[in-house]
Amino acid sequence: MRSDLDIAQAARLRPIRAVAADLGLTDDDIELYGRSIAKIDLGILQRLTDQPRGRYIVVTAITPTPLGEGKTTTTIGLGQALARLGKRSVVTIRQPSMGPTFGIKGGAAGGGYSQVLPMEQFNLHLTGDIHAIGAAHNLLAAMIDNHLHHGNQCGIDPYAIFWSRVVDISDRVLRNVVVGLGKKEDGPMRQTQFDITVASEVMAILALTTNLHDLRQRLGRIVAAYTRDGAPVTAEDLHAAGAMTVLLKEAIKPNLLQTLEGSPALVHCGPFANIAHGASSVLADMIGLHCADYVVTESGFGADIGFEKFCDIKCRASGLAPDAVVLVATVRALKAHSGRYTITAGRPLDPRLAEENPEDVADGAANLAAQVRIARLFGRPVVVAINRFPDDFPSEVEVIRQVARESGAFDVVESFVFAEGGAGGCDLARAAIQACEAPGTFTPLYPLDMSLREKIETLATKVYGATRVEYTPEASRRLAQFEHQGYGNLPICMAKTHLSISHDPKLRGAPSGYVFPIRDVRLAAGAGFIYPLAGDIRTMPGLPAHPAAERIDIDAEGRTRGLS
């Protein structure tokens, strides 16, 4: 089969005006970025206020291997399949960071015959939204140090500054840096760090905002530091929020692209799911739901992390609720969850993974059962999509089918969207349509008036399988501080590994009966959540020994080579 890049470059793209017209958008509603990309003016939401909303399908997954299990590919393929069935559909997905694109993971435009185009622009820069986010974030960082330099009227404690700087490249040497070296006029010297841009709270804010005024208010609420007396210092206190909003006035507009089969795709924002809430923007979903019969979106990683945050954070911010859930599973990942195989990104797969072994699938299927159970906690039907690989055996697929049904899945469907595009997802589309019409009421996992500890313990016991939570003294102090400062009604955004339902990436399958540790707790007041830290979570990745960047080049005709 041809590479993703070859397939993408061979495709004939529709004019983006024609794609916009499929959604009922006029030339007044879009701003062109070349022939194949446009931004959508937010005024469309006022014009379409009285339009009925379409159905809302969210795609999640079992706990993935480091290679991923095809969730984005399934999302795009399902959108294409719905269009083939005569439904007006749109997919809404995240814009990828260039860090993973140049590292091990590669791009995030889907795969095979279920991709978003133009693939090169999608993976690299797009319309510059991530750069605008980085500029807004770094403006606040610069104004903090400038405030210290010019007298520190707010009384900021230099040892209680929590606002780093960001760059959208994986660069491990920037994890710990010292700024202000040189003369006195070069600013105060202090230790700080760089994070990758998509880990910025500004990214999470942009993804959760509902309009420009809301964006301005959220940016003003960012707590960047504390005074020596322990009082929060906000971006509003530093008079930075207005300029930050101006830098984001174009980035707030969702980007319109198209799938390989020419159906609409909205690409907007890209917060990480292990650090932030891991979903594309509220605004893209709102526009899609007013313009289409079906919106297909995705949540990051497995149901335990991305889907839970989608429901408890994103849906609360948007006021929207999913009609159906599609949960992606693969034979390969469930074999890995048996504990008999190790899958490492950038290394050859164990050849035994390609051998027929339904017993290994059965031994790893506890993860599938747990993720279906987690997804069902929120009250909507779950369709399990078996993302088929060429070396899967019918006996192995049957194990997935049986376990999914026993776990309460609404339906179980094989998906071939990687190899066949929308045509390979029509059965999945029919199942998703039926699931949207099934009875059931969407319900978040916990009420916001619970204490922060109660919310954390609800997550740990009901979702992660732990028996109890253990807090470090620092974490306990932070929780008390945030409650005292009036942040106790915020939802929880757990920062934990995506490679296990637990906090420990080595615990595969469905861990249970363990203690869930919270080592620290942090506040994202602008985004509107509290994020406890469970385990070692890095906000600045590093590059592997042989990063994908080594294979990427361009020929004399301007065609990109080696991008995946």
Curated annotation (Swiss-Prot):
Its EC number is 6.3.4.3. ATP binds at T65, P66, L67, G68, E69, G70, K71, T72. Keywords: ATP-binding, Ligase, Nucleotide-binding, One-carbon metabolism. It comes from the Bacteria. SUPFAM superfamilies: P-loop containing nucleoside triphosphate hydrolases. Pfam families: FTHFS. It is an enzyme of class 6 (ligase). This is Formate--tetrahydrofolate ligase. The gene is fhs.
